[in-house]
Every structure is written in structure tokens, then in C-alpha cells.
């Protein structure tokens, strides 16, 4: 960060973080955001440190679109790029204020030229996907129990009465993208029926861009609103890959044996308020079915098999 830059905190955030009873509607979000210096583990990264960082982290997305991830002084992770979404930073602030789950703290978020920079807490660990195949069953059981508790806490938050981002903005997921910013596609939505209709509209937009009639869009428009109904807005991570779960080794206090425990859930880019089936239903079409992970997810989340089957059809329509 350039020396002498005027630091403005996210309006109202300091009091929000200190007041756990603050209603979501009182949270005001704007950029730039810098956490107070006495709440930082060290000086915030300078621009030259970010530009010349030698340690980067792997990402499941193309860095040109999902952003670059670099580690600074083993204190900070900086995610940056022209397509990095502000929603991730706002979600981390929301989590800190509303929940007690392992997730990175947000230390700064700002724009520099055409790039968004999200400066987060560095949490050491390795991804669950890296070690899962070699884990003994008893350690898998421990980890799944921890994850069940984390996601139960998230899902227990009272419904805010809308489907959208934590800032009460558009649904932060590519299935609800509209170049024109059409609110019938992007949301936010107060009715699940409109949430489902938006998926059909997005499908129609994609097929129209290809110069073809969307017959599947017609099917989705006819059936999604009635087939996907009765699901309350639920706080959702939205990307439950094993690569988004960090674990660390700790010594079992009873046996003295080292085992893996949950260190953090990361990558909150698409987090927000979705129908209660979405956490399970969205990840279901992405299962590889080459090990026990799909079955294990049912120990973390209650399964929604019918809704998941429909979302598999949606995924094939929107992404292929």
C-alpha cells in the first residue's frame, strides 16, 4: 500500500464486528476497507511485495479469471485480479460478525487500477483433497463431524427473507450472471419462484447468444418454479470442494496420536443466501464418483437428491 494513503474503514464495520446483535440490514458495505492497525498481525503488504511475491497458492480456477493468490510474510494471503469479486471480502466480514467458524479474517480490500485486492489472514494447512485418499477411516470420521458442525452453524442463521449476497445484492453465482444487469436474472429475489425462473432466463440468454432456440430453457421455465419450491434462504458457502477445506495436524489429547483437524474453510467468493438445497445440490453435479467423497458429503449436509438431480440437468444446460 502506498505510504501516506488515506485509510478509510468500511463504513460502520468496526461497530458491527463488536456488536454481534447488529441486524444485517444495518451493515453498510463500501470500498476501500482497511482494518485498524491494532487488529493486524503486522504491516499490511506493500504493492511491491504483492507484485514480486515468490510464493503463490494453487487455485482450482484459471488465475486469469479467478484471481492470483500469493502469500506475504506468512501473515497474509492476497487474492487479486480484474475479475476477483468483492463478495468474498464482504462474506468474510459477515462470517466474523455472525458466526464462530474457522475462516480467514479480512484485513483489507481495495481497488488499484483495474484490479481488486483482498488481503486475508494466512492460515497454514493443506487441502483436504490432498490427503483424503490416504486418511484412515477414524480420522475421516473426526473431520466429517467437524464439518457437519460448521455447516450446521451456518445453516442455523435466521433467514433474512431474500436470496442474494450478504450485502442484499445480486446472487453471487455465475448461473445468475447478466451482462445487461437484468434484475430478473441477477436478483436479489424475495421469492424462491423468481430464483428458479432466473435460472431459466439465464439459460435462454445463453442459447440466444449462440443464435439458437433454447428448448431446454423452455423446459426449465415450465418446471423449475414448481419443482424447486419450499426452500428457505439459507447461508451457503456455495463451493464445497475438498480443495476449499484446509486441514492441519494436531495431537489427540486422549491418545497422543497426531491426526488431522479442520483449519479453515476458504474461497467464499459465491457465499450468500440460497435455497436450502443449494449447498448440496450445486456440488452434486461436480462429484467425480471415483472414491467415497460423495457419500461422505452426506455426513456433512443433509442430501437433497431430487433437487440435486435437477441441478445436474441445469449444469449440463448452462455450462456445456
Language model features by range: what are they?
Residues 192, 230-235, 248-316:
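Active-site Asp-x-Gly
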Residues 60, 83-86, 214, 291, ...:
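Conserved phosphate-coordination/catalytic loops
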Residues 1-59:
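Juxta-kinase regulatory segment immediately upstream of eukaryotic protein kinase catalytic domains
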Residues 49, 53-189, 232:
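ATP-binding pocket architecture of kinase catalytic cores
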Residues 9-16, 22-23, 32, 299, ...:
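Charged phosphate-binding loop/patch that engages nucleotide di/tri-phosphates or the phosphate backbone
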Residues 44-45, 140, 153-238, 248-260:
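An alpha-helical support segment within catalytic cores of ATP-dependent transferases
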Residues 243-244:
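Conserved protein-kinase catalytic-loop position immediately C-terminal to the HRD catalytic Asp
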Amino acid at each position: 500500500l502506498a505510504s501516506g494513503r488515506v485509510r478509510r474503514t468500511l463504513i460502520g464495520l468496526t461497530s458491527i464486528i463488536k456488536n454481534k446483535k447488529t441486524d444485517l440490514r444495518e451493515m453498510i458495505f463500501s470500498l476501500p476497507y482497511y482494518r485498524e492497525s491494532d487488529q493486524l498481525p503486522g504491516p499490511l503488504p506493500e504493492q511491491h511485495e504483492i507484485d514480486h511475491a515468490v510464493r503463490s497458492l494453487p487455485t482450482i480456477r484459471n488465475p486469469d479469471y479467478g484471481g492470483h493468490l500469493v502469500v506475504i510474510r506468512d501473515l497474509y494471503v492476497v487474492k487479486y485480479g480484474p475479475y476477483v469479486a468483492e463478495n468474498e471480502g464482504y462474506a468474510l466480514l459477515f462470517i466474523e460478525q455472525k458466526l464462530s467458524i474457522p475462516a480467514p479474517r479480512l484485513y483489507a480490500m481495495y481497488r488499484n487500477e483495474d484490479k481488486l485486492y483482498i488481503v486475508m489472514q494466512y492460515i497454514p494447512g493443506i487441502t483436504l483433497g490432498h490427503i483424503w485418499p490416504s486418511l484412515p477411516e477414524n480420522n475421516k470420521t473426526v473431520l466429517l463431524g467437524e464439518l457437519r458442525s460448521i455447516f450446521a452453524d451456518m445453516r442455523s442463521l435466521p433467514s433474512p427473507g431474500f436470496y442474494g449476497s450478504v450485502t442484499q445484492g445480486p446472487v453471487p453465482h455465475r448461473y445468475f450472471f447478466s451482462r445487461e444487469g437484468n434484475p430478473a436474472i441477477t436478483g436479489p429475489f424475495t421469492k424462491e419462484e423468481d430464483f428458479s425462473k432466473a435460472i431459466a432466463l439465464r439459460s435462454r440468454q445463453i442459447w440466444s447468444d449462440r443464435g439458437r432456440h433454447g428448448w431446454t430453457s423452455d423446459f426449465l421455465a415450465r418446471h423449475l418454479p414448481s419443482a424447486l419450491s419450499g426452500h428457505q434462504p439459507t447461508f451457503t458457502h456455495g463451493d464445497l470442494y475438498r480443495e476449499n477445506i484446509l486441514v492441519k495436524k494436531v495431537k489427540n489429547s486422549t491418545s497422543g496420536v497426531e491426526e488431522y483437524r479442520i483449519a479453515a474453510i476458504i474461497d467464499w467468493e459465491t457465499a450468500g443466501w440460497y435455497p436450502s438445497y443449494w449447498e448440496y445440490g450445486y456440488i452434486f453435479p461436480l462429484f467425480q464418483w471415483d472414491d467415497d467423497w460423495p457419500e461422505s458429503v452426506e455426513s456433512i449436509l443433509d442430501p437433497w437428491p431430487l433437487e440435486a438431480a435437477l441441478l445436474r440437468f441445469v449444469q449440463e444446460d448452462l455450462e456445456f
